[in-house]
Regions:
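Short amphipathic alpha-helices in soluble, non-transmembrane regions
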Residues: 22, 60-67, 104-111, 199-203
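Acidic/histidine-enriched active-site and ligand-binding environments that engage anionic O-linkages
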Residues: 66, 72-76, 111-121
Length: 218
C-alpha cells in the first residue's frame, strides 16, 4: 500500500480547542492516522501531521480545510508567522513506495476540490508550482493575507492558480504542494532584541547567502 503524509498548517495556535476540533475531525477519517499535532502561541499557528493511503489522506485534508474555513477568521488573526490562509499551507509528502508524482497528483486533486467546491483560491508551490517563482513558498505567502487580499484583483503576479480571483473574506487562500520531507524547529535566544534574531536568520538562510536549502525566520 502506498503511504502519503500530509502536513497542513493552520492559522490558529492559541485556541487549542479549535485546533483539537480540526485534528479530531481529520483523524476520524478511515485509513488515516494522526501522527503529530503542534501549536505555537507566538506564531498563532498549528501544524498537524497525518498519514495513510492517498485517497484517505486527501479526504482528511479536505475535512481539515472545511473545518478551518468554519472556525478560523483571518481578519482577527495576529501572530509572528506569515500567513495567507486559515488552512495556510497544505503539503503532501511521499514515503515508502510512493513517488513525488503520486504526491503531485494528490496536491492537484486537493487544489481542484478546494477551489471548485469550497470556493477558496489555491496557489501551488514547491514540486507542484505552475510558475517558477512560486516554487518558493515565501514568494506569495510572505506578502501576508491583508496585502494579497487588497491587491490580488489588480496584480497579475498574485493571481491564484485555481479558484476565485479574490481571497475568501475570512479564510484567505491555501498554498498546496508536493514536497520532500522537511525538518522545522524553533530556537530560543537569550535576548529580547529581534534584530539579533533577524541577523542570525539572515546568515543561515540560503536565499541570503547562508546554508543550502535552509530557510530561516527571525
Amino acid at each position: 500500500m502506498k503511504f502519503i503524509a500530509a502536513v497542513p498548517n493552520f492559522s490558529e495556535g492559541r485556541r487549542l480547542d479549535i485546533v483539537d476540533e480540526i485534528a479530531n475531525a481529520m483523524a476520524k477519517t478511515p485509513g488515516v492516522k494522526l501522527l503529530a499535532k503542534e501549536s505555537d502561541p507566538s506564531h498563532n499557528r498549528s501544524v498537524i501531521t497525518i498519514g495513510g493511503d492517498p485517497d484517505s489522506v486527501l479526504e482528511a485534508c479536505i475535512i481539515g480545510v472545511k473545518k478551518a474555513v468554519e472556525l478560523i477568521d483571518l481578519t482577527k488573526h495576529k501572530g509572528e508567522h506569515p500567513r495567507i490562509g486559515a488552512c495556510d499551507v497544505l503539503p503532501f509528502v511521499p514515503f515508502g513506495t510512493s513517488t513525488m508524482d503520486d504526491a503531485k497528483a494528490l496536491a492537484e486533486q486537493a487544489g481542484k476540490i478546494i477551489a471548485e467546491e469550497l470556493g477558496i483560491p489555491v496557489y501551488f508551490y514547491e514540486e507542484s508550482a505552475r510558475r517558477p517563482e512560486r516554487v518558493d513558498l515565501a514568494y506569495i505567502r510572505n506578502r501576508q493575507f491583508e496585502t494579497v487580499r487588497d491587491k490580488v484583483a489588480e496584480d497579475p503576479d498574485l493571481e491564484p492558480d485555481l479558484g476565485p480571483k479574490q481571497l475568501h473574506p475570512t479564510a484567505g487562500a491555501v498554498m498546496v504542494g508536493a514536497r520532500k520531507p522537511l525538518i522545522a524547529f524553533n530556537v530560543n535566544l537569550g535576548t529580547t532584541n529581534v534584530e539579533i534574531a533577524k541577523e542570525i536568520a539572515k546568515h543561515l538562510r540560503s536565499k541570503t547567502g547562508g546554508l543550502a536549502f535552509v530557510k530561516a525566520l527571525g
